[in-house]
Amino acid sequence: EVDMRCKSSKECLVKCKQATGRPNGKCMNRKCKCYPR
C-alpha cells in the first residue's frame, strides 16, 4: 500500500510504478494499493 491520496486508479499507476517497478494498482478508499508486492 502506498500512502498517497488518489481520486482515480490512473493516478496510482504512476506511483505504483515508482514504488514497485510495475504499474499495477488501484485507488481504494482514496489511497493507492499496489500489487503485487
From Swiss-Prot:
Tissue expression per record: Expressed by the venom gland.
Cystine pairs annotated here are: 6-27, 12-32, 16-34
Q: Where is this site: Aromatic residue of the functional dyad?
A: 35
Q: Which cellular compartments is it found in?
A: Secreted
| Cellular component, GO annotation | extracellular region
Q: Where would you find the membrane-spanning parts of this chain?
A: none
Q: Name one GO molecular function term.
A: toxin activity
What's in the keyword line of the UniProt record? Disulfide bond, Ion channel impairing toxin, Neurotoxin, Potassium channel impairing toxin, Secreted, Toxin, Voltage-gated potassium channel impairing toxin
What function does this protein fulfil? Reversibly blocks voltage-gated potassium channels (Kv1.1/KCNA1 (Kd=79 uM), Kv1.2/KCNA2 (Kd=547 nM) and Kv1.3/KCNA3 (Kd=492 nM)).
Q: Other remarks on record?
A: Negative results: does not inhibit ERG1/Kv11.1/KCNH2 potassium channels.
The text the record gives for the protein's domains is: Has the structural arrangement of an alpha-helix connected to antiparallel beta-sheets by disulfide bonds (CS-alpha/beta).
Family membership? Belongs to the short scorpion toxin superfamily. Potassium channel inhibitor family. Alpha-KTx 01 subfamily.
> What's the protein called, per UniProt?
Potassium channel toxin alpha-KTx 1.10
